[in-house]
């Protein structure tokens, strides 16, 4: 809670809230004059009740609710650490990730030594390789989910809203894709295309969009029967405006939740493929291939395989914790009044 | 029609017919409905559930849900036949010229947006407020808030300056319906189609909402078509009433005449089945069931339930004819 409140993004709005809280605790009921005063106090910022002001307040309410889930805050901090480390990898690592020091091979972890997390069978620093491996995992997670969401939601919204032959065609195609086990499918695709970063992204996304398609399609179909859609039509809004302006805002929360949870899956899949030697090419450090490297030394040098695996577990756990909290906060059925 | 006010006709519906194809055959939801609405008219359409009241309104707006469709008839509005308009022109008419208020305010408002934004949206759709991105300008935001709070004030929502920032679930049912009426009135429509606007509300709130609609009708001259199954509301609110049965209008005329001296046996039956305060007589329901609209016979569709049934009723459809100069009745057994 404190950590979030002190972050610079939320500070502006917090003032307004704290001003208002003296009068009325639920911030939705903040008296407008109080908010206006608070707003006027921060000169140069947006005034009035326009879209920007609303977006700020919405974000704030969302932040406050997320802060109510301690596990999610921990998860968020962990994810932030991983992302920072990955983004600034060349500057934060103690050694180059591919610097070989055969004389130092299989050094045990020690806080005082040159290699805090030890070295592998070629004497490469494991900490540096884990940090560089985070780049691969995070990028794969973000890119595959971005592609899957774009394709899946785009097709799903159109299919769910207009139905008809397009829906039948795409839905049958997704049924076909779902008939393949995911891992086998991706292994097959990678075996054909060969290892490589972009090949991996395409192989994972090729099936990843199906779930988003089904979710978006089902949500749109159920939202479409709601009266507000009919009312929007009676108001003279076009189909495109109804999809983007009326239905999507009611659907976006479930897509966000699924996207977060699936990102963990994608990262695990990437590691599985790298473990099998089908994912990222061997020169690039990736957690999966590091675990595979250390497999043979499990009994003599446990750290080579265990630590990259631990890095993977912690990241995926953090992502899932945040995903769970998002579901609690964003599900309108659980939302407080 | 029979208002005698000599004002001009705003909406002229003739021969409107709508079907819903089903595996059992075509359900004829609306069968040749004729209506004429003058400026400032208040017309009630009453009837049982499933008699085609709502389908009739949706047909006028060309919003009949797929796979239903209007198969015949015309709706003349400002010299144009709405049934022949292109999709884009029809969207222009919806909301701007003819607005609609729905039954359940809770589900008709979009839960994801603040009510002020939803009212503003209705102004934006028809260009009364600038759309995105011009809507972000400080001046247009101020103007937007001014127009929205003014509309909310008009429909009697207290402290609109605060409440336009609230979400639909923070309002009571009556207030939600007022917001919907504000949305419908935003573009100052010529005709307001109200589909059971008070059914989801409790009785005192019903009266307030009806009073609000009456006020709007009197001050702006907006013609109102009120669909309801409640004859008391029709009697209270409307000058003219059309009774629908099985997709057809069976009796239409000034409200006093129809309620005090109903001619059609169905109207008589409806009136007898309303409980009255202080009377301890048992109610007389209309026996039998609503006919299957997918399998209508050649005769009068009310004949199987009719107390005044004659042999000819099973053979031929009665026409809607004028009776005692003031109203129209569709019955073989009418008095002439």
What are these regions (language model features)?
Chain B
Residues 82-99, 117, 125, 137-141, ...:
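ABC ATPase NBD coupling module
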Residues 8-9, 158-162, 252-336:
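Short catalytic/signature loops enriched in Gly
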Residues 186-190:
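A short, proline-enriched helix->beta-strand linker immediately N-terminal to the Walker B motif
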Residues 80-81, 127, 135-162, 271:
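Conserved ABC ATPase "signature" region
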Residues 70-81:
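Conserved ABC transporter NBD signature motif
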Residues 6-10, 19-32, 63-69, 86-89, ...:
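A short, flexible loop at the N-terminus of ABC-type nucleotide-binding domains that lies
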